[in-house]
Amino acid sequence: MPKRKKQDQPPPLPQQQQHLALSERDEPGDEEDERPMGPPSLLGPPPMANGKPGDPKSAFHRGPPGSRGRMIPPLLSLPPPPRGRGYIRGGLGPRSSPYGRGWWGINAEPPFPGPGHGGPSRESFYKEARNPRRLRSWSLVKNTYPPKDSPQMMEDKSDRPVCRHFSKKGHCRYEDHCAFYHPGVNGPPL
């Protein structure tokens, strides 16, 4: 197999020429005139308005006039970053919020109510759930299930449909609490 020849590469610049090239551009990191680094497929062409590249009236042109990076339009971008967590911006007082001026406007409350800003608080919700005597339906539950000490009286459910599981297996997992008719148990046999 024939060997490939090395492609002709330009000779490396001497130190003086490199130093001269850098001195023409002020600093090595100063590249305002060049396009931003990165794959061209992701960066895309510079914004154009009326067929003129770099027109300051372009809808996508943002930032200082020297920068040429393409920016995301404001409607498709994320909300502005938070400016701070202090209460200074919102003023002093009980209704001032830590949000200050931001996504929701000047001194506007956030869309989700916090504690003390309307809506049920967590504390009252959990207290109500833990204390069943305060529940509205407790009176119904208390009258439906008699206390364990009293003699059990079976309710006649013969007017209800027959429990499918009881008719197939002979027993039901809900036993006395089943809403359907168990022949011979909670009513006359069939």
UniProtKB/Swiss-Prot annotation:
Ranges of compositional bias, category Pro residues: 37-48
UniProt keywords, alphabetically: Metal-binding, Zinc, Zinc-finger
Annotated region (Disordered), positions in chain: 1-94, 110-130, 142-161
Cited Pfam families: zf-CCCH
SUPFAM superfamilies (UniProt xref): CCCH zinc finger
An MF annotation (GO) of this entry: zinc ion binding
Alphabetical list of InterPro entries matching this protein: PRR3, Znf_CCCH, Znf_CCCH_sf
Entry keyword Metal-binding: yes
Protein name, as recorded: Proline-rich protein 3
Lineage, highest ranks first: Eukaryota, Metazoa, Chordata, Craniata, Vertebrata
